[in-house]
Amino acid sequence: MLFKSLQSITSVNSIQKNQISSISLGSSQSNNNAALLDAAAFVAIPGLLTAAAVAHI
């Protein structure tokens, strides 16, 4: 009985570790996405301004 309860505790601990690692992976992934969006905006906005200036001329 004691062994079984210990076994269930360790399995819960491993599940929690997996959840924590997936959460941290998720947050780093979203940080990467934000950086990509920032880079895309950094490239796209001057391009749009240039296109607008050319169209205006």
Swiss-Prot record:
Top-rank taxon: Eukaryota
Protein name (Swiss-Prot/TrEMBL): Uncharacterized protein DDB_G0283465
